[in-house]
Amino acid sequence: MTAEEIKELDAQVRKARFVLSQKAGALHDLIEDRLPADYLEIPAYAEDTFLACKAWDELNKKLTENKI
């Protein structure tokens, strides 16, 4: 990868990390503020958080492999 491509990938990793943090925060807020009343919403929030983590992990691995 070129230096420019690595820079772009790094930006994508940072953006994915931000999205991951937002999803995790929403799950945390659900647990802290709305349980047990809204317990049926847990699977959707958990799935969103899982997918955000997976997206970040894939991008981060690609970045790590190409930075070397």
Q: Language model features by range: what are they?
A:
Residues 1-31, 61:
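N-terminal acidic leader/helix
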Residues 25, 29-68:
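Short, charge-rich amphipathic interface segments used for partner binding and complex assembly
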